[in-house]
Regions:
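Core AdoMet radical
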Residues: 115-222, 234
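Structured alpha-helical segments in the cores of large, soluble enzyme domains
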Residues: 96-108, 191-200, 227-230
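Short helix/loop capping segments that flank catalytic or ligand/cofactor-binding pockets
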Residues: 52-56, 62-64, 77-80, 107-110, ...
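Flexible, glycine/threonine-enriched loop-and-boundary segments that flank and lead into catalytic domains
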Residues: 78-95, 210-229
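N-terminal pre-triad scaffold of radical SAM enzymes
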Residues: 83-112, 130, 143-145, 234
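Glycine- and acidic
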Residues: 50-52, 80-83, 93-98, 109-120, ...
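Flexible, acidic/Gly-rich N-terminal and inter-domain linker regions that tether
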Residues: 1-94
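Residue-level detector of conserved catalytic or cofactor/ligand-binding positions
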Residues: 229-237
Length: 237
């Protein structure tokens, strides 16, 4: 460990296996270090003087970096090795869906998205998303329906507040619970505009939202949300 600096030593693995409370404590300490601006290196001791070292999370991607990632020539198909097993049926639900963001400041207790993508929301530009949609329209299997436009939370199209871009997420409070933070920017106008632009593409019949929608965030915004619900969310059968 001589070369590992500014690290937080977690509970030893062998002890956590025997104590659920220690496991929960370790999980909480890991959760407190998921922010790229304040998170430390984490070290988990194992037997025989072995250690697992996790570096701090990477900084959020810029919009240009997000666009560059999604401009790569993805195949929208499963690997051919799955053919012998009949393919991947679940792919049909997401094949013609569009990722518009990553990250989530919802902080649901049951959810691990903060560990995967962080609390600072990163977004693609309209141009990047529209270009991908136009490519989908050209595919023979496309029937005119975009199944989803979203991410961890569909209606988050930017960081919760300006502070998150330079300081990261607040370590001791949530953006939406127990009540929305006064600094949170609740605004669906950009998202509604994006949905309209997608719907206007020749060959697109309907645009749906299947990613989760934060209703407390919707209620914090007094504009445009009715149109969002009326046009783009399937009615229950």
């Amino acid at each position: 460990l001589d070369s590992v600096y500014d690290a937080e030593i977690l509970e030893p693995y062998e002890e956590m296996k025997k104590d659920k409370l220690l496991y929960a404590k370790s999980f909480y300490r890991q959760y407190c270090n998921t922010d790229p601006f304040s998170g430390k290196r984490l070290v988990e001791p194992y037997s025989d003087h072995l250690y697992v070292v996790q570096n701090p999370p990477a900084k959020p991607l810029t919009q240009q970096e997000m666009d560059d990632v999604y401009a790569l020539p993805y195949m929208r198909a499963y690997h051919p090795s799955y053919e012998k097993d009949g393919g991947v049926p679940a792919l049909g639900e997401i094949k013609y869906s569009l990722t518009s963001n990553r990250g989530c400041f919802g902080s649901c207790s049951f959810c691990a998205l903060t560990f995967h993508e962080g609390r600072v929301v990163q977004t693609r530009s309209h141009e990047s998303i529209l270009a991908e949609a136009r490519q989908m329209v050209q595919e023979k299997e496309f029937k005119g329906y975009i199944h989803d436009v979203g991410g961890p939370t569909a209606d988050f199209r930017g960081p919760a507040c300006k502070k998150q871009l330079t300081k990261g997420a607040c370590p001791n409070r949530n953006c939406l619970f127990p009540e929305p933070c006064k600094n949170m920017v609740a605004d669906h106008r950009d998202y509604v505009k994006l949905l309209r632009e997608l719907k206007d593409i020749p060959g697109v019949k309907k645009v749906f939202i299947r990613s989760g929608i934060r209703f407390d965030y919707v209620l914090a915004d007094k504009d445009q949300t009715f149109l969002l619900s009326l046009i783009h969310i399937s009615e229950p059968t």
